[in-house]
């Protein structure tokens, strides 16, 4: 049975890391680890829907967590002014939300090597960076030291930042009452979306692999 990223356990306050909490093991068997019951962040790749898709011959998503048995201790550090929503990509590439992180806080995560994480503004779903990139993949711990995932704001373009501010001030039903060019109505209505970002990242991953293959052939 594959390991899962679902069972969440909060440790007592006062962890050594600044404001760090602890999130319990990503185990498939809660009865083995004392984990809580499955929450919305869990997804079992052996569920009927997933099995039916595999039987239908549909390809699995490019971006998904690897079913690894190699644990990795990670500390999520929110170094942004936003409330952060950690999102785990399960073994079928489905985004699974985790408890939010207030600004300036941290949380210890019992993750696994090869699992994929990304981070979003919990209120607006604006994209955030983790260690200066969009995806975080835990590696193995060295000498028992945890891996730090530093979550920060990217440098948004002026247009992106303006759209964020307008969305925070104007209700969606009132966008088209604003005295702006029509194309900006559509931009405002095109709210940040994790699934769209995953499609873009998957295409970038495929393109990078293709370019690497062409480079190897050339050499």
Curated annotation (Swiss-Prot):
It comes from the Eukaryota. The keyword Endoplasmic reticulum applies. It is found in: Cytoplasm; Cell membrane; Endoplasmic reticulum; Nucleus. Residues 157-166 are annotated as: Interaction with Elongin BC complex. GO terms for cellular component: endoplasmic reticulum; nucleus; plasma membrane; VCB complex. Residues 48-57 have a biased composition (Low complexity). It is a peripheral membrane protein. Residues 9-47 have a biased composition (Acidic residues). GO terms for molecular function: ubiquitin-like ligase-substrate adaptor activity. Residues 1-57 are annotated as: Disordered. Pathway: Protein modification; protein ubiquitination. InterPro entries: VHL_alpha_dom (IPR024048), VHL_alpha_dom_sf (IPR037139), VHL_beta_dom (IPR024053), VHL_beta_dom_sf (IPR037140), VHL_sf (IPR036208), VHL_tumour_suppress_b/a_dom (IPR022772). One of its GO terms (biological process) is proteasome-mediated ubiquitin-dependent protein catabolic process. The keyword Transferase does not apply. Keywords: Cell membrane, Cytoplasm, Endoplasmic reticulum, Membrane, Nucleus, Tumor suppressor, Ubl conjugation pathway. Its main location: cytoplasm. Belongs to the VHL family. The Elongin BC complex binding domain is also known as BC-box with the consensus [APST]-L-x(3)-C-x(3)-[AILV]. Component of the VBC (VHL-Elongin BC-CUL2) complex; this complex acts as a ubiquitin-ligase E3 and directs proteasome-dependent degradation of targeted proteins. Interacts with CUL2; this interaction is dependent on the integrity of the trimeric VBC complex. Interacts (via the beta domain) with HIF1A (via the NTAD domain); this interaction mediates degradation of HIF1A in normoxia and, in hypoxia, prevents ubiquitination and degradation of HIF1A by mediating hypoxia-induced translocation to the nucleus, a process which requires a hypoxia-dependent regulatory signal. Involved in the ubiquitination and subsequent proteasomal degradation via the von Hippel-Lindau ubiquitination complex. Seems to act as a target recruitment subunit in the E3 ubiquitin ligase complex and recruits hydroxylated hypoxia-inducible factor (HIF) under normoxic conditions. Involved in transcriptional repression through interaction with HIF1A, HIF1AN and histone deacetylases. Ubiquitinates, in an oxygen-responsive manner, ADRB2. Acts as a negative regulator of mTORC1 by promoting ubiquitination and degradation of RPTOR. This is von Hippel-Lindau disease tumor suppressor. The lineage of its organism: Eukaryota, Metazoa, Chordata, Craniata, Vertebrata.
